[in-house]
A protein has these predicted regions:
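Short, well-structured alpha-helical interface segments that form or flank functional binding sites
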Residues: 12, 49, 110
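A solvent-exposed, acidic/Ser-Thr-rich amphipathic alpha-helical stretch
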Residues: 27, 31-92
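Short, low-complexity N-terminal intrinsically disordered segments enriched in polar/charged residues
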Residues: 1-31, 35
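A structural signal for alpha-helical segments
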Residues: 5, 46-49, 103
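A beta-strand edge to alpha-helix "cap/lid" segment located at domain peripheries
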Residues: 63-153
Length: 153
């Protein structure tokens, strides 16, 4: 029998992970990962072992007021493999606006995740995506970023 409650809890975990990435909430993001988590972002181009190493990379890569991101994970295919483990496949859509480089990046990919229940709570043990496509466009003078939650006033 499919355990829909556990699947919904895993969906909430992935949604929280994406929100934490986009809001640069590194404490909340760390809480989504097991201590020994592994990441393989962008077809393995950015691979890290250990929660702290993953968070350090993302902070270095993303935590600046001149960059904003939007990551959406949807169409989940989640399989509960035991009482404490699960696997998931997700579609990814992302947008990155980088004002320093004057570009907008848009892309899609497929996430492959593994989950582990730790002290009764689902955590991400392995996460990573393979790109379907990525396009980069130079930002025109006609396009203005008018709201940015990270900009210093």
């Amino acid at each position: 029998m499919i355990d829909l409650l556990q699947i919904e809890l895993i969906k909430r975990l992935k949604y929280k992970y994406m929100r934490a990435v986009d809001t640069n909430n590194w404490v909340e993001l760390a809480a989504c990962l097991t201590e020994d988590a592994v990441s393989n972002y962008d077809s393995g181009k950015y691979s890290f072992e250990g929660r702290d190493n993953i968070i350090d990379f993302l902070k270095q890569f993303m935590d600046r007021p001149t960059q904003v991101t939007q990551h959406h994970a949807h169409h989940p295919e989640i399989d509960i493999t035991s009482d404490t483990t699960a696997k998931g496949i997700w579609c990814l859509q992302d947008i990155v606006i980088d004002l320093d480089a004057n570009i907008t990046l848009r892309g899609t990919g497929i996430y492959h995740d593994e989950y582990e229940k730790v002290d009764g709570e689902w955590k991400i043990k392995l996460t990573g995506y393979v790109r379907i496509y990525e396009e980069i466009e130079e930002r025109s003078d006609k396009v203005k970023l008018v709201t940015n939650m990270f900009a210093k006033e």
